[in-house]
Amino acid sequence: MKPVTIYSTSVCHFCNMAKEFFKKHNIAYTEYNVGTDPERRKEMVDLTGQLGVPVIRVGDEIVVGFREDVVSHMLGLSTS
């Protein structure tokens, strides 16, 4: 499986939804809290050009925000 990374903050509702989705589907992921880690925040801005969270990276694909259908497709999960 491609590596999964989420750039998030502790108070972001959609970040929490994404992390619950990963747990539900047993998807291992690396989390960076951009609210407390300025280096990772800069990395996120360099990748996306903006500060909105969550930013989810699956391999080389990046999506800003959390839409279950989009992330499922990125992960190759069945949506049925």
Where are these regions (language model features)?
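Local sequence-structure signature of Cys/Sec-based thiol-disulfide redox active-site neighborhoods
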Residues: 1-25
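Extracytoplasmic thiol/disulfide redox context detector
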Residues: 1-5, 75, 80
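Ser/Thr-centric signal marking residues that sit
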Residues: 5-9, 48, 53
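Glycine-/small-residue-rich active-site loops that bind phosphorylated ligands and cofactors
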Residues: 13, 36, 63
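Short, flexible helix/strand-to-coil boundary loops that buttress conserved ligand/catalytic motifs
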Residues: 19, 67, 75
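Residue-level detector of anion-binding/catalytic polar loops
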Residues: 28
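Thioredoxin-like thiol-disulfide oxidoreductase module
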Residues: 33-50, 69, 77
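A short, hydrophobic beta-strand/beta-hairpin element that forms part of a small beta-sheet core
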Residues: 54-63
